[in-house]
């Protein structure tokens, strides 16, 4: 099993299959992904934003809801956020930014997370809705200016 390491910018052989997190081995012939995020974040929803409620730099970009990790031990769990990726001509055109965060609360373990983003929708007014399958809530994010 090969995975892409965005920090090394290469595919590496997974430890369970004889790798050490650095060994390329039989992974060298695989294509690199168009875009990569940290391991185990768990993307659950993708929304291409076509509204005009948010500032212009968000138009035609992609929002991604990350459900959060469950198996990064001994590292701190990650994800539990919504990111934005700028797009141009159907491809990512810049670095992602954390758009909404803090869902896990102070406890960042899978069972201890207060909320886990799992769905995205755009409202008729262009606002962004985020659903949560841990706490059962829905957030509405609106832009009111600086």
Where are these regions (language model features)?
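Hydrophobic beta-strand segments that make up the repeating blades of beta-propeller
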Residues: 62-64, 127-130
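Beta-propeller domain segments
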Residues: 1-111, 115, 141-146
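Structured DNA-binding interfaces in DNA transaction proteins
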Residues: 118, 124-126
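A short, acidic, flexible beta-alpha connecting loop/helix-capping segment that sits on the rim
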Residues: 134-136, 145
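Conserved beta-strand->loop/alpha-helix structural units within folded catalytic cores of enzymes
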Residues: 122, 132-133
């Amino acid at each position: 099993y090969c995975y892409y390491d965005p920090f090394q910018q290469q595919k590496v052989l997974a430890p369970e299959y004889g790798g050490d997190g650095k060994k390329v081995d039989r992974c060298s012939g695989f294509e690199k992904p168009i875009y990569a995020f940290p391991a185990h974040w768990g993307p659950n929803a993708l929304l291409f934003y076509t509204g005009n409620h948010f500032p212009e730099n968000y138009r035609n970009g992609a929002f991604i809801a990350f459900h959060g990790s469950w198996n990064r031990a001994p590292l701190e769990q990650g994800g539990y956020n919504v990111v934005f990726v700028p797009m141009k001509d159907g491809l990512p055109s810049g670095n992602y930014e954390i758009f909404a965060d803090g869902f896990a609360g102070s406890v960042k373990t899978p069972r201890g997370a207060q909320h886990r983003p799992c769905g995205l929708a755009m409202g008729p007014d262009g606002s962004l809705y985020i659903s949560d399958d841990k706490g059962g809530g829905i957030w509405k994010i609106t832009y009111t200016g600086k």
